[in-house]
């Protein structure tokens, strides 16, 4: 989270940044950062709280708006950032596939994307960048845990409840999860798969629906 705010400042020309032992000192005096959240939740609120502290410590001004999971709202927010002369935009995209459109709207304002990664083809060093974890590794770890817990089984039946359909984390985790299981040489059956959008209630409804099928399962994975 701190790195996101720091990059939001250091994207701009004329700012000073130095690093020693992993700590980054950023001079953000006079810099205005506009944050467009895809949707406020506990995770994003934690990230933004840390980003605010980092921005304020550097002397930067930071404002945060919630797009409420609406592409239209996010487009309007980027337009607002341009109209109000913000220096940098931090954007958790509602749909990472809209990144190119958001960049076009932003014009000369640099964008730091976070949490959901746009395609590498629309990123550009020092102007349109992404800060986030390697989601494929998360999917790999999930698969490795299942394989470790079920090392005595030659066949594994899996229920897979995924995050939002258009989120890069969902895509990266799910793909590498399946690839790692496949590479194990075991017979892997995904007996149920759907997008629960990281919502407990939706996940419970889908799992109840699955149970009605009477199919056997060995593991339930939520990514």
Residue spans for each PLM region:
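A residue-level marker of the well-folded mature domains of exported/periplasmic proteins
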Residues: 1, 5, 14-223
């Amino acid at each position: 989270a701190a790195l996101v705010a720091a990059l939001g400042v250091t994207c701009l020309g004329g700012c000073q940044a130095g690093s020693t032992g992993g700590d980054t000192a950023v001079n953000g005096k006079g810099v205005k950062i506009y944050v467009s959240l895809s949707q406020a939740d506990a995770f994003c609120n934690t990230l933004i709280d840390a980003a605010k502290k980092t921005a304020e410590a550097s002397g930067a001004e930071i404002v945060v708006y919630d797009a409420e999971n609406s592409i239209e709202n996010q487009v309007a927010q980027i337009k607002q950032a341009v109209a109000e002369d913000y220096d940098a935009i931090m954007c958790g995209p509602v749909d990472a596939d809209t990144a190119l459109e958001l960049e076009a709207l932003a014009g000369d304002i640099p964008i730091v994307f976070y949490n959901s990664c746009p395609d590498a083809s629309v990123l550009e060093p020092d102007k349109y960048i992404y800060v986030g974890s390697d989601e494929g590794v998360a999917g790999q770890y999930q698969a490795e845990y299942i394989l470790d817990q079920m090392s005595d089984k030659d066949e594994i039946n899996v229920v897979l409840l995924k995050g939002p359909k258009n989120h890069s984390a969902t895509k990266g985790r799910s793909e590498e999860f399946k690839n790692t299981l496949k590479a194990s040489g075991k017979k892997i059956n995904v007996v149920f798969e759907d997008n629960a959008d990281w919502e407990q209630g939706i996940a419970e409804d889908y799992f109840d629906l699955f149970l009605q099928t009477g199919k056997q399962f060995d593991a339930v994975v939520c990514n």
